[in-house]
Curated annotation (Swiss-Prot):
Comment field (misc): Two binding sites (pockets A and B) for the dTDP-sugar ligands have been identified in each subunit. It seems that pocket A represents the active site and pocket B is a vestige of the gene duplication event.
Pfam families documented for this protein: Hexose_dehydrat
Name under which the protein is recorded: dTDP-4-dehydro-6-deoxy-alpha-D-glucopyranose 2,3-dehydratase
Domain of life: Bacteria
Length: 474
């Protein structure tokens, strides 16, 4: 056990079975292409008045569903002492329901496999992406939409007798766009054979991680659940051989229990507690119409900032061939420009460490969470005074290409965001990169980050995505 986390060898035994259900990556991609042809999704931008079941409240201007479920677009007033201007109002997604993001896993011939879903979301870049086995809000799996049920939900809602729970933790989502949003991230090992639907397929854990080297293929929800998994040992419980590539070997070593860390876990937790205690973050829900005081404007087609920055809220009408319901309409939040999420790494005492930032975001539940070294939308900082630019932003943007170990565009959640993407980057810093860092930064090994990921609200969603991505290199 490591700080309450069972090693994978303790959590899972080998489950050898016939390998007929398990195919090579090539066959997997052929299946995915077939699902792309079969699963059509048509998304049309429409004025707000054409959003069926949605309306602006006469008193507050809030955009909400007539059922009172799903989510709403409201206003949020924020005051903080950790931003270049300390108070503002903004639109924000309010979705108090806790959804389920669940991966079903099983061993075939001793190799751990993951059951993924080929799923199209209205905001996806490139259409269909790989989702967890279950990706559903409470409104969806309680069938508020009066559509079909959620396949394999029973493994996560009532796992006893069906599966063994390996990970089960509430995690935050994008704090700049959601207010106090959390989802239940679960990994369940199936105990018996699992009947397959056409839109679901087994892929090895290693194969799925390698697909993270491709842009816009493994969706955000799959990445966050993957980040909760410890490294998978060889079927006999021994650690697999270290990779030959130097950085891959460094990642593998940093993931191991015996890796020497610069700070103890107690010191890391004390640091984050101190950051949360000394920073101000005051949040107040206000009518959406009050965001006008901070420059937000609404017309028939969008809610947008007068300067064209940050994001817009738009309406879409959707027709789908393979979803619980065949058509619907909804608002989506559309960011302005791509984001950047970067890990700066370096070896300390011979062990790879990641530089994490205690980052405050408008909608987070408990104040700062551990975020990537750099997390921002660079376009939003083009007119910001130099002293308020994110620390290490210029270092990452000017990094020697020979020191960039991962650099891929990945999509964010397509059910609430329209074409939201981040450039995910891992930089291996030079040996003379300072070990001494500003007060709101700390060096952690990957093993320490994985330990934190089995507890709620420590590591934010962008950092969790990067944890999944960096393991694709090991």
């Amino acid at each position: 056990m490591i700080w309450g986390i069972p090693a994978m060898s303790e959590a899972m035994g080998s489950v050898p079975t016939a390998g007929s259900e398990v195919s090579s990556t090539c066959a997997f991609l052929s299946w995915l292409d077939a699902r792309r042809r079969a699963n059509r999704l048509t998304v049309e931008h429409v004025p707000f008045r054409e959003l069926s079941g949605w309306q602006f409240d006469e008193n507050t201007g809030n955009l909400r569903h007539t059922s009172g479920r799903f989510f709403s677009i409201e206003g949020l007033r924020v005051r903080t002492d950790h931003c270049w201007f300390g108070s503002w109002t903004q639109p924000i997604i309010v979705q108090p329901e806790i959804g389920i993001l669940g991966l079903l896993v099983k061993r075939f011939d001793g190799i751990l496999h993951v059951l993924v879903q080929a799923k199209n979301e209205p905001g996806n870049i490139g259409g269909l992406q790989l989702s967890p086995t279950v990706q559903a809000t409470r409104s969806n799996y309680t069938r508020v939409h009066r559509g079909g049920g959620v396949r394999y939900l029973e493994y996560f809602a009532s796992p006893r007798g069906r599966g063994r729970v390996l990970a089960d933790v509430l995690q935050s989502e994008q704090g700049s766009w959601f207010l106090h949003k959390r989802n239940r991230n679960m990994v369940v090992e199936a105990l018996d054979d699992v009947p397959l639907d056409d839109d679901f397929h087994w892929i090895s854990l290693g194969g799925l991680r390698k697909l993270l080297l491709r842009p816009h293929l493994v969706n955000m929800d799959t990445r966050t659940v993957l980040s909760c998994l410890p490294p998978d040992p060889a079927p006999d419980g021994r650690q697999p051989p270290a990779p030959a590539a130097p950085f891959a070997a460094a990642v593998t070593r940093s993931l191991t229990r015996g890796a020497t860390a610069l700070h103890t876990m107690g010191e890391i937790l004390g640091w984050l507690t101190d950051e949360r205690s000394r920073r101000e973050l005051v949040q107040q829900r206000v009518p959406l119409e009050e965001t006008a005081f901070s420059g937000w404007r609404r017309d028939d087609h969008a809610i947008a900032h007068k300067d064209g920055d940050y994001f817009r809220v738009i309406g879409v009408s959707v027709r789908a061939s393979s979803r619980e319901v065949s058509s619907w309409s909804q608002p989506l939040l559309a960011p302005v420009g791509p984001g950047l999420a970067a890990f700066v790494t370096r070896r300390i005492r011979g062990v790879l460490h990641v530089l994490l930032h205690a980052r405050t975001e408008a909608g987070l539940l408990n104040g700062p969470e551990m975020a990537p070294t750099v997390q921002c939308r660079p376009l939003n900082y083009r007119a910001v005074p130099a002293e308020y630019r994110p620390a290490y932003l210029d270092y990452v943007l000017s990094a020697d290409p020979g020191r960039i170990r991962y650099d891929t565009l990945q999509s964010e959640e397509g059910g609430r965001f329209h074409h939201a993407e981040n450039r995910y980057v891992v930089v291996e810093a030079e040996d003379d990169f300072p070990v001494e860092v500003p007060r709101d930064f700390r060096w952690l090994t990957l093993h320490q980050i994985l330990a934190l990921l089995h507890h709620s609200n420590y590591v934010n969603v962008e950092a969790r995505s990067l944890v999944a991505c960096i393991q694709a290199l090991s």
